[in-house]
A protein has these predicted regions:
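Non-catalytic, mostly N-terminal accessory regions of nucleic-acid modification and defense proteins
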Residues: 1-201, 268-277, 385-388, 410-418, ...
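Helical mechanochemical/support elements of P-loop NTPase systems and associated helical scaffolds
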Residues: 6, 13, 25-26, 143, ...
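Conserved, well-folded catalytic cores of nucleic-acid-processing
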Residues: 16, 150, 154, 171, ...
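A structure-centric signal for secondary-structure junctions around beta-strands
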Residues: 30, 165, 210, 240, ...
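Conserved S-adenosyl-L-methionine
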Residues: 184-304, 309-311, 320-324, 337, ...
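A conserved structural/catalytic subdomain of Rossmann-like adenosyl-cofactor enzymes
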Residues: 279-280, 284-289, 293-480
Length: 480
C-alpha cells in the first residue's frame, strides 16, 4: 500500500468514525493521537539505538530516575512503557480510555524543562476532547481503540518516514478542511497556494546559508513547513532553518507545534507562541516580562494567510513601530494591520508573501492611506491575483502580495493568475503548470505577457490615484 492509498483509507475510515462530531473538532483527536504515536515511536527508536531491546522495555518506568533523566535530555520527554502507543495496541481488549488520560497527564509532567515551549500543553485539546468521543466509558474506549488501530500502521520511526507521515498528516488536514465549512480557513492554506508562496520565497533566499522564517497566523503550520522544505532544497541543510510561529486559537496552535515536530524539525529550531499577533508585538519577548524583554526580531521571510477582513482594536497603536510609518487599518478590517506586522518583521533584505482579499488593492479611507505609503516607500514587489473559490470555506477573491524593504526598481509586477486552474469538487485548484507559470513570471519580471502579467510603473500607479486595480491587467478584479 503506497502513501496515497494509506492516507485515503485512513481518511475514509475516520470520516465514518467521527459520526456526529464536527470535522473541525474530530481532526484534533486523530491528529493528536498521530502525534502521540510519533513521539512514542521516536522514544522507542532512540532506546533501541542505545542498547535497549524489546525484552528490557517493560523496565522503562518513572521509578528509574537515571533512565528517566537520560531519555528526557536526549528525546525531550519521557513516556513509560505502560504509556507507550505500542503498549496500548498490545493490550487488545484490556485497553481502556482511562489509559490515555493517565498517559497524557504523565507526558505533561515529564517534559524536559529545555523543551517545555515545544511540548507543554500540546495535548490539551485532545485531553479535553476525549469525553466527546462517547457518552459512557465503554463507548469512549471503543471510539479511542478504533482510532489508535486506524493509525497504528503509519510508519513513523525513520528519516524516510517523515515524507509518508507528512503526506498523511497534510492529506487529513486538507480533507478535514474541505469538510469544515467556514472554519477551514482558521487552520489550513491549500497545498498549491503554499507551494506557490514557497517557490517565490525560496527563490529570494536561495543564496543564504542560514535563515529565519515566521508565520504570525500559523494555523496548522503547513505553510511554514512548505516554505522551509522549499528553501532547504537550495540550502542543502534544513537544520539551518529556524521556524517562528504564532497562532491565536489554542487547538490550532497545538497543530502548528505537532506538525513542525513531526516533519523532523529540531525542537531547538522551533519557537512558537499562542497569542494575538495584532496586540502585543511578537517576536520577541519573554512571557513573564513582555515589556522589559521586548526585543523585536527581524527575519528573512514572513509568510501568512491571515483571517480576511476581521475586526481588530487599533486603539493606542498610533506610535506602535509596526504601524507608525504607514497608518492604522480601520477597526472593521485588519488586513493591512497583518500586512504591516509582517513587513515590520523582515530584515532589510527580507521578503513577505501574504494572502489578502482583493479589496486591499482599491478600498479608500485608512486603507487608501496605508496603500499610498506602501507605494511611496517602494515596498510592494508583486501582486498575484488567484482564482476564485481556491480556499476552503470562502469564495472571496484573493491575491498574494509580495513585499520587500530594499527594492532596486520602483515597478510593481501584477500577475493575473485567476484563469489558470482545474475544478476539484466545489473548489478550484492551481495545477503544477499554473504554479510554474506564475513563478517564472515573478522571477523574470517581464514588461508584459498578454492577458497574464505586466510591470506597472510607480508613475502609472500614482496617476491611478494609488489604486492597484490596474486595467487591463487585473482580470481577477473583474476590471478591464
Amino acid at each position: 500500500m503506497n502513501k496515497q492509498q494509506l492516507a485515503s483509507k485512513i481518511w475514509e475510515s475516520a470520516n465514518k468514525m467521527r459520526s456526529k462530531i464536527e470535522a473541525n473538532e474530530y481532526k484534533d483527536y486523530i491528529l493528536g493521537f498521530m502525534f502521540y504515536k510519533f513521539l512514542s515511536d521516536k522514544e522507542v527508536k532512540w532506546l533501541k539505538e542505545n542498547d535497549w531491546t524489546d525484552e528490557y522495555l517493560p523496565d522503562l518506568t518513572e521509578d528509574d530516575a537515571e533512565t528517566l533523566d537520560t531519555v528526557r535530555k536526549n528525546v525531550g520527554y519521557f513516556i513509560a512503557y505502560e504509556n507507550l502507543f505500542s503498549t496500548w495496541i498490545s493490550k487488545g481488549s484490556d485497553f481502556k480510555a482511562d489509559d490515555v488520560t493517565v498517559a497524557l497527564q504523565a507526558f505533561s509532567r515529564l517534559i524536559d524543562p529545555h523543551h517545555k515551549k515545544v511540548f507543554d500543553g500540546v495535548f490539551a485539546t485532545l485531553q479535553t476532547g476525549l469525553s466527546k468521543l462517547g457518552e459512557s466509558s465503554g463507548a469512549r474506549t471503543k471510539a479511542i481503540r478504533d482510532l489508535i488501530y486506524l493509525i497504528k500502521d503509519i510508519p513513523m520511526d525513520g528519516k524516510q518516514d517523515y515524507d509518508v507521515l507528512g503526506f498523511i498528516y497534510e492529506y487529513l488536514i486538507s480533507n478535514f478542511a474541505a469538510n469544515a465549512g467556514k472554519k477551514a480557513g482558521e487552520f489550513y492554506t491549500p497545498h498549491e497556494v503554499s507551494l506557490l508562496m514557497s517557490e517565490i520565497v525560496a527563490y529570494h533566499l536561495k543564496d543564504r546559508e542560514e535563515i529565519k522564517i515566521y508565520d504570525p497566523t500559523s494555523g496548522s503550520g503547513s505553510l511554514l513547513i512548505n516554505i522551509g522544505q522549499c528553501a532547504a532544497r537550495y540550502m542543502g541543510n534544513g537544520n539551518n532553518i529556524k521556524y517562528y510561529a504564532q497562532e491565536l486559537k489554542e487547538n490550532t496552535y497545538n497543530l502548528t507545534r505537532m506538525n513542525l515536530v513531526m516533519r523532523g524539525i529540531l525542537p531547538d529550531n522551533i519557537v512558537t507562541r499562542n497569542g494575538d499577533t495584532l496586540e502585543e508585538d511578537w517576536p520577541y519577548f519573554e512571557e513573564n516580562d513582555p515589556v522589559n524583554t521586548y526585543d523585536p526580531l527581524f527575519v528573512d521571510a514572513v509568510v501568512s494567510n491571515p483571517p480576511y477582513s476581521q475586526a481588530w482594536n487599533p486603539n493606542d497603536k498610533e506610535n506602535n513601530p509596526r504601524f507608525s510609518d504607514y497608518g492604522l487599518a480601520p477597526k472593521g478590517k485588519a488586513d493591512y494591520a497583518f500586512l504591516l506586522h509582517d513587513l515590520y518583521h523582515i530584515r532589510n533584505d527580507g521578503i513577505v508573501t501574504i494572502v489578502l482579499p482583493h479589496g486591499v488593492l482599491f478600498r479608500g479611507g485608512e486603507e487608501g492611506t496605508i496603500r499610498k505609503n506602501l507605494i511611496d516607500h517602494n515596498n510592494i514587489d508583486a501582486i498575484i491575483g488567484l482564482p476564485a473559490n481556491i480556499f476552503f470555506g470562502t469564495g472571496i477573491p484573493t491575491i498574494i502580495m509580495v513585499l520587500r524593504k530594499n527594492k532596486k526598481d520602483s515597478d510593481v509586477l501584477i500577475i493575473d493568475a485567476s484563469k489558470g486552474f482545474e475544478k476539484d469538487g466545489k473548489n478550484n485548484k492551481l495545477r503544477a503548470c499554473d504554479i510554474k507559470r506564475i513563478v517564472d513570471a515573478y522571477k523574470e519580471r517581464p514588461e508584459k505577457i498578454k492577458k497574464f502579467a505586466r510591470r506597472v510603473s510607480r508613475a502609472e500607479i500614482i496617476q491611478n490615484d494609488y489604486n492597484l486595480n490596474i486595467p487591463p491587467v487585473c482580470g481577477f478584479l473583474g476590471k478591464g
